[in-house]
Amino acid sequence: MTNKMDISNYEIKNKGLHLVKATKENFWPLMDLRVTKEQENFVAANSVSLAQAYDTRADGKFVQPFGIFDGETPVGFAMIGHHSYEYEGMPEVDKHSYSLWRFMIDYRYQKRGYGRDAMKLLYDYIITFPDGKEDLWSTSYVEGNDIAAKMYRDLGFEPNGEKDGDEIVLVLKL
């Protein structure tokens, strides 16, 4: 876990890209975003993610869903959690880290650098420690999702040896 995302060397390529907190006023376009048919087994639908966010907040726990926008156009969705859920067999790291709970770029906007750029924006958000200080940012990916695995590793995430069901857990030191 010695790698750290080097934000000083990472420059966002899509200058209009920004995060917008998901609200009741803007969630409909986020629910319309889709991945490719081949990617559907790798990430839950945004409608499921937004329902989970609503339920998590109703329980008084921290979760922040975001629309990823290029200008006025929604191109992706992400959701950050922190001590947001507990279940039997959950990775230990999720008990003491910020978690990238969901991340997707719509199939129409993939292969344009939005994924890496959005991860940089999410990193900048997380290091403000909106729900308290942590040393780690965790995420996971379904085995076989080589695109996600490569992106996360290129950004400094490393496997920590844990699994979350069929997902490989990765961490980034903050």
Model-predicted regions and their roles:
Residues 19, 111, 141:
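Conserved SAM-binding loop
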Residues 105, 111-125, 150, 154:
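Conserved acetyl-CoA-binding loop-helix of GNAT-fold acetyltransferases
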Residues 116, 142-161:
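Conserved active-site alpha-helix within GNAT-family acetyltransferase domains
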Residues 171-174:
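Short beta-strand-to-coil "C-cap" segments at the C-terminal boundary of structured domains/repeats
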Residues 12-17, 21-108, 125-129, 161-164:
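Acetyl-CoA-dependent GNAT
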Residues 99, 104, 138-140, 169:
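Conserved beta-strand segments that form the floor/walls of ligand-binding pockets within enzyme
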Residues 1-11:
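Acyl-donor-binding surface of acyltransferase catalytic domains
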Residues 133-149, 165-167:
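Conserved beta-strand-loop-alpha-helix junction that forms the acyl-donor binding cleft
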